[in-house]
Each structure stands twice: as C-alpha cells, then as structure tokens.
C-alpha cells in the first residue's frame, strides 16, 4: 500500500539519521525491528519491519490488541477473535459470547422480559395442561389459567390431578418467541404448602413435536431445581435461549401436590422488545402529554394527568383519563430520540371504584411531533384490541416495527371513561 511505503520511508529516514545503516539486499539489520521483527529492505532502500504475531507499528514497537480490546461487547459478554491473517498484526473478525438473557451482535439486546403470565398479556385460552385437580368435593378447580405468578385467592394456582402420572402445563405464545428463562412459585392448598421440587422444560414450534432441554453433557433431559416452599420465587435461565411457540413444564418431583404459579422470560424473536421507559420512569413526566386531562370533582388535586399513564402505576389516581369521551383524544409519548418501536402494552384503571379502560385504539407515530403517520397493516390503519378490565395487561405487537421519536395512542372505544396506563416496547 502507498501509505505503508510512505511510513516505511519515513522510518528509514529516521533510522538513517540516527546513524543506523542497513546492509544491502532483501534483508536488513534485524536490530532495527523490535520484539523479534524481521527487517526487510525495499527497492528504494526503504526499510520495512515484518512483525511477529501480537505486535504492530513501524518497528514492531506496539502491542497488537486486536478487535477485542477494548471489548466491543456489552453486558460483560466475552469477545472472541474468530479469524486472522496468520500475520499476527491484523485481526479481522470477532464474535460476542452473550451471557444468558442477552442477544444481538454485541449482546446489546436484553431478552429477559416477563412474557405475560403475571400481567395477563397471555390469555387464559393460551394456557393448557394435561390434567386439573378438583378439590373440595369437586367444587374447586385448580386450572392451568390460574398458574400466574403472584396470583392470590383461595384457589390461585394450577394443580395436576393426583392420578396424572406424567403431568404438564403448556403456554402457547401464538407466534415464535425467544424464551430465556422461567420463574416458578408454589401455592398453599387447604393450608398446606405444595410446589414443584424439580421439573423439565420442553419446547415446540408446532405444538406436536416437543424437544426437552438437554443437560450439560447432552446425554439426557435437564432437570431444573424448583421451589422449597409455597411462596418464594425460583428463577432458572436457559442457556442457550429457546426459539419456540410452545413451552411445556413437566413436574418431576413435587412436595405433596404438583402445584404451580409461574412466569416465562424472554423477548420477541427479533430481540427488540425491551420496555422503553414508561414503567421505570426513564421517560420523564414532561415527555408524556395528552389532548386533555380529566379532574375528578373538577379539582386539580384529583387530576388524571398524562404523566400518570405508566404501566402498573399505583395509587388512587394512577392513570391518564381524557376530559371527554371523544375519538379526538390522544395520549402521546416523546421517546427523546428516535427508537425502533415493536409493541405496546395497555392497562385500564379505577376511578374511585369505577372500572375504566380503552377497549380499542389506533397508533400514530412521528419524527418531529408535527407530521403524523397512522400505523397500518395490509394497507389499512390497524385497529388494536385493548383491555377488558381495569388491571390486566393487553400486549399488541407491531408486525411492521417502525422508527419514531413520538408515539400517540388514539382511543376508538372505551368503558366508562377513556383511561389508560401503558408501556411501549422496542430498542
């Protein structure tokens, strides 16, 4: 390369000026090159240093660190060089070995979000089981739809039938997902603790052919450690993560009955479904605005302002409510910078005992907050199904993710008043 020749010529001039002269021929005095480099003489008496592996620079005076220094990988991932040129002073390719729960070329994408059992984004119809225990003379049904983390009540979990020798419980995501782990919890039945002590995990793309996660040796099914009481959480992460539409848990050993509450962890398959900052307050109040706000009894102290519209916000006044029930109302989020938006989670609320929520809505997005584009699928504006109660999560995924800084929710139908808590998903 011409640039290399110029540098080499400069090196030669400097060395000669120091009183060091190379012998004639292809090879020159090796003492001119440091760290065991080989000295070569060019046609114009230009000096070149061919550096050994691990060194670079004009006279091999610099340590070659390669593309892994500094580490380009995020979240403490390990950087591995995958190819070199056998010269030792040029490295061209590397990969990042991601820790459990992260994905992406540089492990920049988190993949350990709760997938919807606890919050309700996964509907009852998506949860099934091999059997159900019927308690209290057949009046108590411990069905699979109850197997949601932290569920409360007298009957608050799934329990397999006592006669089921190979019980299982299954979740259908309705689409292929990346699943990175599971959180399990037992429950109390008739005042006595019941839980899974060990279990296996199987996964499937079609709901017919299932494969079990294998142990470290690859010779058998992996048995995961479960719980030790009825209420504490046990988290198990999958390494590697799974790509599946269906996940099954198979109890292996149980304390008294096989009773379970659980949550699955992961992300959308494209790995871009992290919460964008409403629930955790990363997005400041000033970046959440609305067309109007309702005030109970017309008092400012009881205002249902837009900054309250954060998913799972708590308190007596804990959501955004529009001043009027009109399709002209909207709630807007400024993400601060342009983000890739892949989904949305919505939730209603109560106004002093009155259940209120948005039943259907559209979504619009903008780069400048002035010109807006309504989200479309198949050439028409998409109407999303909203909530059915005041507290459950309803998750909708955008089949065509979009890049935007501003996102608006445009309510179309509602129960009682337009009331909303939400989170946006993306990266």
From Swiss-Prot:
GO cellular component terms, A-Z: acrosomal membrane; external side of plasma membrane; extracellular space
Domain of life: Eukaryota
Membrane topology note: Peripheral membrane protein
Span of domain EGF-like: 24-61, 64-108
Residue positions with a glycan: 61, 230, 280, 390
Protein purpose: Contributes to phagocytic removal of apoptotic cells in many tissues. Plays an important role in the maintenance of intestinal epithelial homeostasis and the promotion of mucosal healing. Promotes VEGF-dependent neovascularization. Specific ligand for the alpha-v/beta-3 and alpha-v/beta-5 receptors. Also binds to phosphatidylserine-enriched cell surfaces in a receptor-independent manner. Zona pellucida-binding protein which may play a role in gamete interaction. Appears to participate in the O-acetylation of GD3 ganglioside sialic acid.
Protein name (record): Lactadherin
């Amino acid at each position: 390369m011409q640039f290399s020749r110029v540098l080499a010529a400069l090196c030669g001039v400097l060395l000669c000026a120091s009183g060091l002269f190379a012998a004639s021929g292809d090879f020159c005095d090796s003492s001119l090159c440091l760290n065991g480099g080989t000295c070569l003489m060019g046609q114009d008496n230009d000096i070149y240093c061919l550096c050994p592996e691990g060194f670079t620079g004009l006279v091999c005076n610099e340590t070659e660190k390669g593309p892994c220094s500094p580490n380009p990988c995020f979240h403490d991932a390990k950087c591995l060089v995958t190819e070199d040129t056998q010269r030792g002073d040029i490295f061209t390719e590397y990969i990042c070995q991601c820790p459990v729960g992260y994905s992406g070329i540089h492990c920049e994408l988190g993949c350990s979000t709760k997938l919807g059992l606890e919050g309700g984004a996964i509907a009852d119809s998506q949860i099934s089981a091999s059997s159900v225990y019927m308690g209290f003379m057949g009046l108590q049904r411990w069905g699979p739809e109850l197997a949601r983390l932290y569920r409360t009540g007298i009957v608050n979990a799934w329990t397999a039938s006592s006669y089921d020798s190979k019980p299982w419980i299954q979740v259908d995501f309705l689409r292929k997902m990346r699943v990175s782990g599971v959180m399990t919890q037992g429950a109390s039945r008739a005042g006595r603790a019941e839980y899974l002590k060990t279990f296996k995990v199987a996964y499937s793309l079609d709901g017919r052919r299932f494969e079990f996660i294998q142990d470290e040796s690859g010779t058998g099914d992996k048995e995961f450690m479960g719980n030790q009481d009825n209420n504490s959480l046990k988290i198990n992460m999958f390494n590697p993560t799974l790509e599946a539409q269906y996940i099954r848990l198979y109890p292996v050993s149980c304390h008294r009955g096989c009773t379970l509450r659980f949550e699955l962890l992961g992300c959308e398959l494209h790995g871009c479904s992290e919460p964008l900052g409403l629930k955790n307050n990363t997005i400041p109040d000033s970046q959440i605005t609305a067309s109007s706000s309702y005030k109970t009894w017309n008092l400012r102290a009881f205002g249902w302002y837009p900054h309250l519209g954060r998913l799972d916000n708590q308190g007596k006044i804990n959501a955004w409510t529009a001043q009027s029930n009109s399709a002209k109302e909207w709630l807007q989020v400024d993400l601060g910078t342009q983000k890739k938006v892949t989904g949305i989670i919505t939730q209603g609320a109560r106004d002093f005992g009155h259940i209120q929520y948005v039943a259907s809505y559209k979504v619009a997005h903008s780069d400048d907050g002035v010109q807006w584009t309504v989200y479309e699928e198949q050439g028409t504006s998409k109407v999303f199904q909203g909530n059915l109660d005041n507290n459950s999560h309803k998750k909708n995924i955008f089949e065509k993710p979009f890049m935007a800084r501003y996102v608006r929710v445009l309510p179309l139908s509602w129960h009682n008043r337009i009331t909303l808590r939400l989170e946006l998903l993306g990266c």
